[in-house]
Structures are given as structure tokens and as C-alpha cells.
Amino acid sequence: MAVKTLKDLLDEGVDGRHVIVRSDFNVPLNDDREITDKGRIIASLPTLKALTEAGAKVIVMSHLGRPKGEVNEKYSLAPVAEALSDELGQYVALAADVVGEDAHERANGLTEGDILLLENVRFDPRETSKDEAERGAFADELAALAADNGAFVSDGFGVVHRAQTSVYDIAKRLPHYAGRLVENEISVLEKIAENPEAPYTVVLGGSKVSDKLGVIEALASKADSIIIGGGMCYTFLKAQGHDVQKSMLQDEMIDTCKDLLERFGDKIVLPVDLTWASEFAKDAEKKVTDLDSAPEGWLSLDIGPKSVEKFADVLGASKTIFWNGPMGVFEFEAFSDGTRGVAQAIIDATANNGAFSVVGGGDSAASVRVLGLDEEGFSHISTGGGASLEFLEGKELPGVAILKD
């Protein structure tokens, strides 16, 4: 990755300089606005600690949720400021706005080693504007917070696939560097994209075939096996002629799945049994059947135990594994066995077969934590679901491309 990194910035010296860091604190919150998964916050700490220890005046920005360009208390970064303070062991102030009077006053008042968190950048409609002039004006205002001799560090890997102001446009206005998280994520994904050790297995789950179509097309030539579970597997099974009853289905993608099976059928590995629910509810009645015994009027919420076994056999022989998307509705304990079983098979392959295993962010990373699995059992857990998929599809990531300038 031919870009300047945090090491380059630290070598230049940051003592007394304002450094704006774009992190990704788009974390899940419960109804009491408590953070339920601190993974992305923990991942941001190495860059922030390195800067504060070197005497920088650090200004951090992030989005949270989709407030649609309006101030909305529900999406305030207050819980993030609190969590950062706890994790860093130092007070992290939260500005009352993004580029308003409070943000400027607090930025001007920073001393060496201080951290200021701006309020949710998506409270300003210009953050996600399609109008380059609007984004440019917002970028000017953000850059102004850094005063003279400021710098920008891109460390929110989960957003580098978006050409948004705080990710892309601001990098045109300040000396720019890749933070440790972004640098590490890119190097891991480059290893998989450019030189994966065979056998290379891709595990795809999640709800929609349409979301993963690009990655199937891109990886079919490189991967030895593509395991498909989760909501997207039902469209493939339907394309094979199986009855999936009321399971999630993308009717408009059935012909596409038929085409993929015709072209890559020797690589695509599908479930051989399914776990069914009488309704979409965590306490629904549950049945496991083979593919030809679908219970009338039910819907499948997970793969079955024979499928886990089949997938585990493939994974156990693999040397490179990329996993993106759960195998079922893991949030419901009764329908979490498929995701747990496949995740454990990846952990086992990593330990016993020396596999290089990457969890591609998003719901997969969340499931590892929710199910209490050993995070250290994987070679790498990415913080970016969409970004990691787009990288492996060979797409240019705007937030990375702009750093190469």
C-alpha cells in the first residue's frame, strides 16, 4: 500500500500539532443506549494512543447510524466518548456540534495529548451529499479545526469504501496518512487477494444474494470452494429445485443463481439440511429436516447439523479462509448452531491446519462476540464488512485511493 502511514507522521513529529482522525465508531447500542459490542472502539485505540503519547492534539470524528443529516439525540456519540474515556484511561471530551462554535472552542483549547470527539458527522447533511461543492465546503470547515500545520489520519476502515466528506474530501485539504487499523486491514486483505495459499475457501452468509454477487463472481476464479449459508442459500436451493417454503427468497435472483451454479457448481458448496421455525421468533417451534422434507408453511432460520459437518470437512482441509455473513439468525439462540459450528470449524482449521483465517467484519464479527467464541482463534477479524468485500471484489476504495495522492 503506497501511502504515508502513521509511522511517517510520527517520524515527522506531532508534538503540539492538531491531528484529525477519522475513526469508525458505528457501534451497536441497546435500548438504554449502551454499547453492546466495543470491537470497533478497541480497534481504534493503537492509533489514538500513539498520537496522544507523541503529544498531538487529537480531534476524532465518526458517524453513528443514519440520522439523515439532522441532529438526533438517538445517534449522539455520547456513549462512544464515555467508552473511549474508559478504554484510554483519559478524559475524552465530546463537542456539542461538528464544526460549530463549541467544536472550535474545544479544538482551540486542546493541549498536548488531549482528545476531542466531534459530534456525529452525519448530523451535517453535507457529510453524505452527492454534491462535490457541498462536501468541499464541509471539508474546509472540518480542516479548519486543525489550524495551521494540522494533519489527517484515516483510521476508519469500515467507511473507506464511501466517498464521504470525513473520509475522502478532507484528505484533499490536509497532509494525509493511513492509521494503524487501516494499514493493518489493507495488508491482511492484500495477502488474501493477491496470494492466497490453497486450498482457499470462501464462506458467505447473510440475507441477500444480490449483496454478495460481486464477490462470488470475483472470487470464483481464485477460490477452491465457496460455501454458501445464511438467508442467501435459500435462493440457491430454490434454483436447484428444492422447496424452501416461507424462507427468505430473492425471486428475481433465481436465474442468476442457476447461472452461477452452472458456471461454478464444482466450487459452490450448499447446505444438505436445514433448521426450520414455525414463525420468525426466538421461541418458535423448531425442526431439522433434509432438503426434500420442508415442513409446510415454515421458514428456515439456520442450516442443519449435517450441513455444519459438511462445511467443517471443507474448512478443515483449507489453508486460507475468508468468512463474511452468518449461517442463520444467530441472534436467536435456538438458531445459532450453524453460525457457531462454522465459526468453530474455522477456529479449528486455524489451529490444526495452520489456515490463515479472516472474518470479514459486519454481522460475522458481531456473531463471534455474541456467541462468546474465541476472537484470538482467527488470524484476523476485520472491522469493515462492506469495505472488505469491495476490496476483494477488486473495487477501488475511495478512502484508500485518496491517501495514495
Curated annotation (Swiss-Prot):
InterPro entries listed in its UniProt record: Phosphoglycerate_kinase, Phosphoglycerate_kinase_CS, Phosphoglycerate_kinase_N, Phosphoglycerate_kinase_sf
GO biological process, one term: glycolytic process
A GO term, aspect molecular function: ATP binding
Pfam families: PGK (PF00162)
Subcellular location per the Swiss-Prot or TrEMBL entry: Cytoplasm
Any coiled-coil regions, as ranges: none
Keywords in alphabetical order: ATP-binding, Cytoplasm, Glycolysis, Kinase, Nucleotide-binding, Transferase
GO cellular component terms attached to this protein's record: cytosol
Domain of life (superkingdom): Bacteria
Positions that bind ATP: 212, 331, 361-364
Residues annotated for substrate binding in this entry: 24-26, 40, 63-66, 122, 162
Recorded metabolic or biological pathway in which this protein acts: Carbohydrate degradation; glycolysis; pyruvate from D-glyceraldehyde 3-phosphate: step 2/5
Reactions catalysed: (2R)-3-phosphoglycerate + ATP = (2R)-3-phospho-glyceroyl phosphate + ADP
Membership in a protein family: Belongs to the phosphoglycerate kinase family.
Protein name according to UniProt: Phosphoglycerate kinase
Organism annotation: Corynebacterium efficiens (strain DSM 44549 / YS-314 / AJ 12310 / JCM 11189 / NBRC 100395)
